């Protein structure tokens, strides 16, 4: 097992990429401290994982108290922290002229500030053991702006560019202290993020069009991103740090 006896924190664990990552980590032997704002979903997931292998911290990870509690729970329950997966994220389909200040701040808080807060409270524990792995969820939008059919991504792109630069800054600061920091950069992963954006037919057509835009010819699945996260979190990636790992079906190779 690639994460046998390692302790991993996963934010946004209740759905999508976070859910797929949690289930994969559990199969690979990790002990888990899971966060989501959805209490019911997190409790169901904890049942699937097994309470002997998992703990749950329900709350808004954009709040410092939640990030602090995640680190404290991991150390209290399992003694140390080996892996941090900063996965929590939100998406607002608003153009710059329509987005409210509150929506802008919420995007920045969940997609970027939460990464800062979790790193702030986890890194001291990793420094004491002189080892750790951080995996941030970035995006192809860390590199490019993008407008889909009727979907504005401008503010989301800004947060993901920040996630990439956070990863690079963590690398230059902490690589010599045994802490690796990497990010995965997915494109068009078929989750429920757009479920309430339009009719089921509209959503299905959007995913079809997204898949057609990729050289591989289809959208990705959360499990495919989880596999990349597992690699970066594992000792197999012991010489990999500062890496933006593309999981994009060839999109940026065009």
Tell where the protein language model's regions lie, with residue ranges:
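Short, small/polar-rich loop/turn modules that mediate ligand/substrate recognition or access, typified
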Residues: 85, 175, 180, 240-242
């Amino acid at each position: 097992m690639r994460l046998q006896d390692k302790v991993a924190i996963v934010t946004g664990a209740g759905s999508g990429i976070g859910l797929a990552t949690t289930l994969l980590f559990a199969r690979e032997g990790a002990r888990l401290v899971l966060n989501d704002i959805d209490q019911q979903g997190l409790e169901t997931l904890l049942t699937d994982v097994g309470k002997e292998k998992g703990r749950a911290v329900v709350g808004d990870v954009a709040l410092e108290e939640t990030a602090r509690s995640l680190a404290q729970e991991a150390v209290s329950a399992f003694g140390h922290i080996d892996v941090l997966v900063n996965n929590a994220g939100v998406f607002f389909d608003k153009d710059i002229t329509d987005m409210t200040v509150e929506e802008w701040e919420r995007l920045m808080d969940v997609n970027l500030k939460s990464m800062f807060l979790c790193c702030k409270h986890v890194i001291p524990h990793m420094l004491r053991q002189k080892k750790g792995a951080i995996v941030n969820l970035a995006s192809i939008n860390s590199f490019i702006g993008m407008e889909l059919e009727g979907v504005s991504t401008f503010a989301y792109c800004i947060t993901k560019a920040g996630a990439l630069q956070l990863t690079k800054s963590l690398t230059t600061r902490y690589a010599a202290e045994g802490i690796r920091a990497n990010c995965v950069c997915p494109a068009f992963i078929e989750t429920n993020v757009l479920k309430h954006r339009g009719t089921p037919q509209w959503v299905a057509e959007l995913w079809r069009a997204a898949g057609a835009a990729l050289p591989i010819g289809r959208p990705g699945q959360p499990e495919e991103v989880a596999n990349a996260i597992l690699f970066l979190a594992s000792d197999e990636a012991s010489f990999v740090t500062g890496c933006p790992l593309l999981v994009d079906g060839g999109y940026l190779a065009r």
